[in-house]
Regions:
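Nucleotidyltransferase catalytic cores
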Residues: 1-74, 100-101, 106-112, 123-124, ...
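Conserved two-metal-ion catalytic palm core of "right-hand" nucleic acid polymerases
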Residues: 1-244, 279-288, 469
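Inter-domain linker/hinge segments that demarcate the starts of reverse transcriptase
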Residues: 64-77, 339-358, 375
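An acidic- and aromatic-residue-enriched active-site/binding cleft used to recognize and process polar
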Residues: 89-92, 109, 197-200, 323-334, ...
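A generic structural signal for well-ordered alpha-helical segments enriched in polar/charged residues
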Residues: 120, 124, 215, 307-314, ...
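Surface-exposed helix-capping loop/turn segments at secondary-structure junctions
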Residues: 128, 314-321, 356-362
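Extended charged low-complexity segments that act as oligomerization/scaffolding linkers
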Residues: 158-170, 177, 183, 346-356, ...
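Conserved polymerase palm-domain catalytic core
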Residues: 183-324, 328-342, 429-509
Length: 509
């Protein structure tokens, strides 16, 4: 692929739309909805981000449109790719006590606007050029996203690239909680299955998404239009990595997970990682998998999940809910004595599905074929711990309540680290206050019921329920502390707004 000029790009309808002022302005207008990692922007880009909140500063907007257009044209050069840095965000402690990290990618603000301008070709229908004031319409690809996918759904409101994640995550939690309570009562489905994909974004082979999208482009596109779409898609999928690793960070980034359960020992896994690292030292570094943190990754992740979700639904028929790579399924198809084998069968079906996609080395950036065909790639379901099932007929009302609250904890924890404004801060503070009071009321109710049982003198009933009640009470206390601590930290963040230290201390304590 040699570099082409602006005039050559604009020979196609999709090329004219790509470079148009209207398309690039739309990317600027929806800026707040896709800059997911604001704190990773440099100072200059943060200033530009805030200046771009004024969507009617014509001089600034026109200057940004020109810079974005130039960057898009530059990316059509054969050897030019989106350049990204990777940062490691603490994720959890492993079973052996080591801290694990999630790799998050970031790039300049102009580049992110260029990415979204390119992504528009795939998420929206390209409007007819004679349309005076075209409305946003979802593309064929966007309409393929199943209705039970809640995360990162494309919006047709110009101020949002994706539907607001908070509302969508809340819907996911609320609907799955409602289903839990419904099927716990009716037992139409006897099991709740939760499936977790291991190291999801880094283990997606971009070639699979490339083939899926190309196979689902509109049939009416002529050869030149399809060629243009392929070129843009390749630039969205393959990103250069500008971060320099030491051995420790390289081990985190290039950690092998594909088929890890099939290795005889840890030494083989470590040797595989060293081979991948040695290869990376000798070549231009490219982002592993899909670059989580950049705007295109979440739409591309949903596209990949379409076939994964279909495999899940066939294995566990019933009612399902998906949020990116998290899933909850209510089903009757669990083999209790052989659940792990069912998970292994899922992994085999996922691998078989991946092998069905035609490979083409010409699609890979030059010199990267070995990297993209290595054992770094291959999405797997966790075989232990995170993927599990729960028998609904074995749950009492208190356990159903705890499962629902645990989902609220997950959402609140995510909200806490993704606030960018005082308004979001206060909204979350109010939500945490409500949750804290609800849990405290439930805990107080439990203590009162326990006291009444003791007063009744029914020793058999007391002894029978004591252990379960104590466990329930401890978990409620832990949840209460979780919500209350985060609420108090939010109060502390805006102490100056609260007036005197006395007022502040009253709120805090």
């Amino acid at each position: 692929m040699s570099r082409i000029t602006k005039e050559e790009i604009e020979k196609t309808k999709c090329g004219r739309f790509l470079l148009s002022d209207e398309n690039i302005y739309l990317s600027i207008y929806s800026l707040n909805s896709y800059v997911f990692e604001y704190n990773l922007l440099n100072t200059e880009d943060r200033i530009l981000y805030h200046r771009l909140q004024d969507k009617f500063d014509a001089r600034l907007i026109n200057g940004v449109i020109t810079r974005v257009r130039e960057q898009i044209i530059e990316l059509f050069d054969k050897d030019k790719y989106i350049e990204a840095k990777v940062y490691f965000k603490p994720k959890k402690l492993s079973e052996n006590g080591e801290l694990e990290f999630r790799p998050l990618h970031s790039t300049g603000l102009i580049t992110q606007i260029a990415i979204v301008s390119m992504l528009h070709l795939f998420v929206y229908e390209i409007p007819e050029e004679e349309e005076g004031d075209p409305k946003l319409r979802l593309s064929n690809l966007s309409r393929l996203i199943p209705s039970d996918f809640y995360g990162n759904r494309v919006s047709v409101k110009p101020e949002y690239l994706f539907k607001p994640w908070k509302q969508q995550y809340q819907k996911y939690n609320q609907n799955s909680n409602d289903a839990l309570m419904k099927y716990h009562t009716s037992l139409e489905y006897k099991y709740e299955v939760t499936l977790d994909l291991e190291n999801f974004f880094p283990t997606i082979n971009p070639i699979i998404i490339y083939r899926y999208i190309i196979n689902h482009l509109p049939a009416y596109l002529n050869d030149e239009e399809r060629k243009m779409m392929k070129r843009v898609l390749q630039k969205l999928l393959f990103c250069k990595l500008t971060t320099t690793f030491d051995e420790k960070t390289a081990g985190q980034y290039y950690k092998v997970t594909k088929g890890a359960g099939n290795y005889d020992n840890v030494d083989k896994i470590e040797q595989n990682e060293k081979e991948c690292w040695a290869f990376k030292e000798k070549s231009d570094k490219f982002v592993r998998g899909i670059p989580q943190g950049l705007p295109q990754s979440y739409f591309l992740g949903n596209i990949y999940m379409i076939s994964i979700a279909e495999i899940f639904r066939k294995k566990f028929t019933g009612v399902s809910y998906f949020y990116v790579d998290d899933s909850v399924i209510f089903t009757n198809d669990v083999r209790e004595d052989n659940f792990k084998e069912q998970l292994k069968e899922l992994n085999k079906q996922i691998a078989d599905e991946a092998n069905n996609f035609e490979d083409d080395s010409a699609i890979y950036p030059e010199g990267t074929e070995k990297f993209y065909k290595s054992d770094l790639y291959g999405v797997n379901v966790h075989l232990d711990g995170k993927s599990n099932y729960t028998r609904l007929d074995n749950l009492d009302d208190s356990e159903v309540y705890l499962k629902c609250i645990s989902r609220e904890m997950s959402q609140a924890g995510s909200d806490f680290f993704r606030m960018y404004s005082d308004e979001e801060n206060r909204n979350l503070e109010e939500k945490l206050d409500v949750l804290s009071k609800q849990v405290k009321a439930k805990r107080d109710q439990l203590v009162e019921e326990k006291s009444q049982k003791r007063d009744s003198g029914n020793e058999d009933a007391i002894e029978k329920d004591e252990d379960d009640t104590q466990k329930f009470e401890k978990r409620l206390t832990r949840y209460y502390r979780f919500f209350e601590y985060r609420k108090q930290r939010l109060v502390a963040m805006h102490q100056p707004e609260n007036g005197s230290d006395e007022d502040y201390n009253m709120q805090l304590y």
